[in-house]
Amino acid sequence: MATAIRSGRIGGWERFCQWVTDTNNRIYVGWFGVLMIPCLLAATTCFIVAFIAAPAVDIDGIREPVAGSLIYGNNIISGAVVPSSNAIGLHFYPIWEAASLDEWLYNGGPYQLVVFHFLIGISAYMGRQWELSYRLGMRPWICVAYSAPLSAAFAVFLVYPFGQGSFSDGMPLGISGTFNFMLVFQAEHNILMHPFHMLGVAGVFGGSLFSAMHGSLVTSSLVRETTEAESQNYGYKFGQEEETYNIVAAHGYFGRLIFQYASFNNSRSLHFFLAAWPVVGIWFTSMGISTMAFNLNGFNFNQSVLDAQGRVLNTWADVLNRANLGMEVMHERNAHNFPLDLAATESTPVALQAPTIG
C-alpha cells in the first residue's frame, strides 16, 4: 500500500526521467536521444524539402547560381542540397542572419541547417549507444566502432570546410555532388597518393573481404539440425546455449587453405579483428581528409624519374598529375582566372619583341 501511494505521488518530471532511461522500452530513448531525435528530425525534414524545392544557390559567390532540387530540373542522381555560398564563407548563417528568406535560400542557408543538425544528431546517436551499453552492463566498444563513420562525416562536413575557409567547399548532399566532391578533392589534394587514404582503402576493402570470408566459413560449417527438406535456418533457436557452427572445422579448413596461423582459433579475437580492421582504416581516412583540409596533401612524385640525359621518363604519377590538372581547370570554371597549379609548372618561352623581318 505504501508503495502504491509513493508511486502515485511521482511528478511528471520523474515519470519522464523513468521513461527516458527505461531499457524495457521497445526503442531506447536515453538522454542523448532527447537531443538526437529533434536534431535528426530537423535535418531530415529540411533535407527533404530542400532536395525537392530549394531554389538555385550561388555556391561560388560570383552570382552564378547552381540548381540542385528536383523541381528545378534535377533527378535523384543529379539532385543535391547545394553547399552555402562562398560569399558566406565560414560565417554561421541561420535564417535570422539573412535579410529575407529568399536571400537565405539564395546563399545556401539550408545546407548549414541540415549539416549542423545532422552532426549534432549523429554525435548524440553515438552517445546513446554508449548510454544503452552502460545501462545494460555491456562493454563500450559499439560506440567506439561507430566513431569511425562519425569521424568521416565530421571530416567532410566540418573539418574540411574549416581548413579551406568556406562551407562552399563542404560535400554537397547528393549522389552526383558527392562524386564531384571526390573528383575535386583528388584534383586539389592528390588524395590517391596519401598514405592515410591508402590505409582507409585497405580498411574498407579488407573489411569486406574478411566479412565475406567469415560469413562463408560459418555458413559452410553449420551444425546440421534439420533434414534436407528444411531450411538450415530452422536449426537455430534464438538464445540457444550450444554453438550453431563448428569453429574447429572452419579453423581446420582455412588453416589448410592458406597456412595454420592465418586462421583464428579464438572466436573472441576473431570478432575483435573483424571490428577493428575497418574501424582503424576509416579513422585513418578521416585523419587524412582532416590534414589535407589544411593542404598537407598526398605524395608528389611528378617527373621524378630521369634518364642519363636528364629527360623526364613519365610514370603513373605523371599520368595522375595530368588527370588532376584536367579536373582542376574544369571545376569552378568561372571562379578561377588562372589556376595556380598550371602557373606552377615549367614556364613556356614567349617572344618579348617582334622579330625583325627582312
From Swiss-Prot:
UniProt keywords, alphabetically? Calcium, Chlorophyll, Chromophore, Electron transport, Herbicide resistance, Iron, Magnesium, Manganese, Membrane, Metal-binding, Oxidoreductase, Photosynthesis, Photosystem II, Thylakoid, Transmembrane, Transmembrane helix, Transport
Reaction catalyzed: 2 a plastoquinone + 4 hnu + 2 H2O = 2 a plastoquinol + O2
The entry's chlorophyll a ChlzD1-binding residues are H117
Q: Disulfide pairs?
A: none
Q: Could you give the cofactor binding note from the entry?
A: The D1/D2 heterodimer binds P680, chlorophylls that are the primary electron donor of PSII, and subsequent electron acceptors. It shares a non-heme iron and each subunit binds pheophytin, quinone, additional chlorophylls, carotenoids and lipids. D1 provides most of the ligands for the Mn4-Ca-O5 cluster of the oxygen-evolving complex (OEC). There is also a Cl(-1) ion associated with D1 and D2, which is required for oxygen evolution. The PSII complex binds additional chlorophylls, carotenoids and specific lipids.
Residues involved in a quinone binding: H214, S263, F264
The EC number(s) given in the record are 1.10.3.9
**So where does Fe cation get bound?**
H214, H271
The Swiss-Prot or TrEMBL record annotates one GO molecular function as: iron ion binding
Which amino acids does the record list as binding pheophytin a?
Answer: Y125
* GO CC, one annotated term: plasma membrane-derived thylakoid membrane
Q: Where is this site: Cleavage?
A: A343, A344
| Site positions for Tyrosine radical intermediate | Y160
The record's note on quaternary structure and interaction partners says: PSII is composed of 1 copy each of membrane proteins PsbA, PsbB, PsbC, PsbD, PsbE, PsbF, PsbH, PsbI, PsbJ, PsbK, PsbL, PsbM, PsbT, PsbX, PsbY, PsbZ, Psb30/Ycf12, peripheral proteins PsbO, CyanoQ (PsbQ), PsbU, PsbV and a large number of cofactors. It forms dimeric complexes.
Q: What is this protein called?
A: Photosystem II protein D1 2
- Origin organism of this chain? Synechococcus sp. (strain WH7803)
